[in-house]
Structures are given as structure tokens and as C-alpha cells.
């Protein structure tokens, strides 16, 4: 589909080095929530080798990464090595930072720096270059401490309103109701995703109503099944506009019902295939 947000959604395609099979060698078993039979949470462990320059510390092992963290801290920031994404993931979990909003805040800042809307004078001397793994680690530590430029990043999508960025920065912010887009897809490609994010009840949160099955080819090839699934005529192509309101409304109602009974979104009908 070419629908992956790269460098704050400036591009929609990235390198194959972050494909799923390249993470298999770092998997250290599976885990799950208490009494959940699915056990969908991968464990990771990074070896200490001269190639990846990974030291054995608290961030060399942990849970994940999931797709959102992979997208936000991989292509979203110009990173193409699995070891770096895994380490960022473990840092985020240890520091208690949300990977979606934090990754988006850093990507936004990097594009503003790229375009000259902010300079080293605004960042405390930091050069916000895409793909700089050491810089990203430093930014995470600064953010959690609200130290230096980390104070601006911690303001997240509200940095303009709080006087940290110029008003022109809003043209490069992927957010709704002050909340950054929570998934790494480029929603301009998948029209149902775009509509869902625009009307979501909690900012740009894909977990409220995302029509995940729009990217399932088998479902799109069966018009009758798709009609019954969403209770309305929905165009087969993810890039078409027709009928996507039926799919978004159906998903929002189903997900709200799942939330009401405490059901994990990944086990909720319509969210996963």
C-alpha cells in the first residue's frame, strides 16, 4: 500500500532491514498478561557484540517491540537497524514513556529542525538529524527529566500553544485534539483510517475505531462479506472513499463494547484479522 509514515510522514516507504524476520534472532520467548491464553507479547534480548555496540544494561532486554513502537522509532525517525529500535523500546518501557506520542514529538521536532523552523539555539545545541541513534537515546532521557530541550518534547503536541515552537510548526504536526497520531500508518493512503482518526473520541487515537481489516486483501476481494461485516456498502479498495463511514461507525461501536467489558483490543472482533 505504501502507507508507512517515514520521517514524520514525508515519505511512505522504508528499508527492508526492519521487516519482521530480522527481529527473530533477538526473540527471547513469549509472554502474556495474567491468565491470557494468547501470549502475544514477544520478549527480547540484545547480545553484546562489537557490531551493535550494545552494552548489557537494563535496556538490553525487555518486552516487545510492538508495531507502533517499531514504526514510530524506526522509519518515523529515520532508523533502519533492529537493534536500535529494540533498545529504544526497552528504554521507553523502563522510563514509562508512551512510544506513540514520544516518537511523534521527536519526529515533529526533527522535521522542524530540518526545515529551519527551529535551530540549535532552540534545542540547547543539539543537532536534530534523522537516524541519529545516540541523539534519540539522549532525547528520551531529557524528556523524562524535562531537562533542556526535553522540556519542549514533553509538551508534546501542545508545544506551539505553550510558546515553544512558532505557529508555522503546526503545519507539520500530525495530531487531532492535541493528541499525536498513535499509529505509524500514513492515513492519507487508507481512507477509512483517515476518517477514523479525524473523528476519534480521543484525539488521533487509532484504537478507538480503526478499520484494521482494510489492509486484509481477502476481505476486500469479497464484497458481500464486507457488506455484511460493516452493515453497509463499503468500497473494496483501501484508497477509495465510498462507504468508509459505515466501516468506521461499526468498528467504533464494537470497540466501545469491548472497552465496556474490559476486553483487550487485540482480542476484539474487527480489530484483528
What are these regions (language model features)?
Residues 1-273:
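Extended C-terminal regions of large enzymes
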Amino acid at each position: 500500500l505504501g502507507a508507512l509514515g517515514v520521517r514524520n510522514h514525508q515519505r511512505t516507504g522504508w528499508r527492508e532491514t526492519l521487516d519482521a524476520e530480522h527481529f527473530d534472532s533477538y526473540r527471547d520467548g513469549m509472554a502474556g498478561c495474567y491468565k491470557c491464553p494468547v501470549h502475544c507479547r514477544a520478549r527480547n534480548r540484545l547480545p553484546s557484540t562489537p557490531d551493535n555496540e550494545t552494552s548489557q544494561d537494563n535496556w538490553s532486554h525487555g518486552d516487545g517491540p510492538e508495531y507502533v513502537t517499531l514504526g514510530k522509532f524506526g522509519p518515523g525517525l529515520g532508523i533502519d537497524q533492529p537493534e536500535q529500535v529494540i533498545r529504544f523500546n526497552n528504554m521507553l518501557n523502563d522510563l514509562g514513556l508512551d512510544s506513540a506520542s514520544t516518537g511523534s514529538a521527536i519526529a515533529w521536532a526533527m522535521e522542524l529542525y530540518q526545515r529551519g523552523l527551529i535551530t540549535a539555539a532552540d534545542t540547547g545545541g543539539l543537532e536534530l538529524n534523522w537516524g541519529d541513534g545516540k541523539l534519540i537515546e539522549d532525547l528520551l532521557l531529557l524528556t523524562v527529566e524535562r531537562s533542556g530541550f526535553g522540556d519542549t518534547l514533553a509538551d508534546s503536541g501542545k508545544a506551539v500553544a505553550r510558546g515553544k515552537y512558532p505557529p508555522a510548526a503546526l503545519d507539520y504536526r500530525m495530531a487531532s485534539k492535541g493528541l499525536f497520531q498513535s499509529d505509524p500508518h500514513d492515513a492519507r493512503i487508507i481512507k477509512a483510517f483517515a476518517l477514523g482518526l479525524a473523528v476519534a473520541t480521543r484525539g488521533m487515537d487509532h484504537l478507538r475505531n480503526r478499520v484494521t481489516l482494510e489492509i486484509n486483501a481477502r476481505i476486500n476481494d469479497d464484497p458481500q462479506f464486507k457488506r455484511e461485516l460493516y452493515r453497509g456498502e463499503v468500497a473494496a479498495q483501501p484508497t477509495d472513499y465510498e462507504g468508509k463511514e459505515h466501516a468506521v461507525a461499526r468498528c467504533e461501536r464494537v470497540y466501545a463494547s469491548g472497552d465496556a467489558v474490559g476486553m483487550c483490543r487485540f482480542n476484539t472482533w474487527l480489530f484483528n484479522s
